[in-house]
Amino acid sequence: MQQTLEKIGKQVFYKRLQQKMTQEELCQGICSVSYLSKIENGKIEASEEILQLLCARLEIAVTDLRDVEEDVKGKLDEWLNALVHLDKQQVERIYEELQGEMKHVLDFEIINYYKLLYTRYLIMKRDFPAVEKELESLKKMYKKYSPFQKLLYTYSKGLYYFLQHRYKKALEYLTRTEVMAKEQGYHENGIYFNLALVYNELEVEHMTLHFANVAMEGFKNEYKFRYVINCQLLIALSYIQKKQYNEALSIYNNILREANSFADKESITAIALNNLGFLYYNLKDYAKAKDYYLQCLKYKKEEDLNYIDAVYEIA
């Protein structure tokens, strides 16, 4: 019963905001503001007459939620899974399907779930003006979110700040995301990998190594070996910063041996050779550094992203 009250209340609340109506405007001549507030917060069951009048003003019908909403909820779960695993074909397919189906959804929880995942989708597409706009809009609804929705919002903020090179803000939000994920029993390896990336930018090598290793073990368990390579690249870079050159050299040589197993072998090889050049530059062996940089250029395409963008592909 309580769940039903909350669902109806949240729908009334959401539709009111959607139509840019104040509580006073919605309830005028129908009920008091305090009574409407209790309805929106699921604290009281509105009489059928009042509910009919409120819905008429909001131009919605007082009916049970359509079955399509459960189907949409399942599809949103699939979309999240595709976004987490960066299955771009699936991401685009589900996005297209949702465009028509979301028009039939009234449920506040489902609409917010969609908007939160849509923001993650925009991050994947690197559409930063749209991401900023969505995050600002979502912020207004934060108090109404479920714990998991708050996690999704916080994670998207962290990713956005990272891609804007605001690393301290990114660390703040990604750290909060990790805490929330542990509290909720939610696991996503990308959270740990992105924490490793942020710590790398902030030059906190021991934390970079910690989170990169956590992410790497997770990816191994999921048989996502291309992402394991990303973690190894980051770990080796941290070893260079810590002047543990032999450890870094061992990792890069291993990556070069394994590169042919992957579809994007040229990209992997280019990054490894580039970073070997950086390693020998730090050792002041400039001849070897130059040799590796020149080898790297044979593989590096003009449109290739820089190192961080290349390893960041799982975000």
PLM regions: where:
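Residue register of alpha-helical TPR repeats
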Residues: 73, 113, 152, 190-192, ...
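A short, Lys/Arg-rich alpha-helix, primarily the initiator
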Residues: 1-18
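Short alpha-helical DNA-recognition segment
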Residues: 20-38
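Amphipathic alpha-helical segments of tetratricopeptide repeats
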Residues: 96-103, 135-143, 175-182, 213-224, ...
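DNA major-groove recognition helix of helix-turn-helix/homeodomain DNA-binding modules
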Residues: 47-64
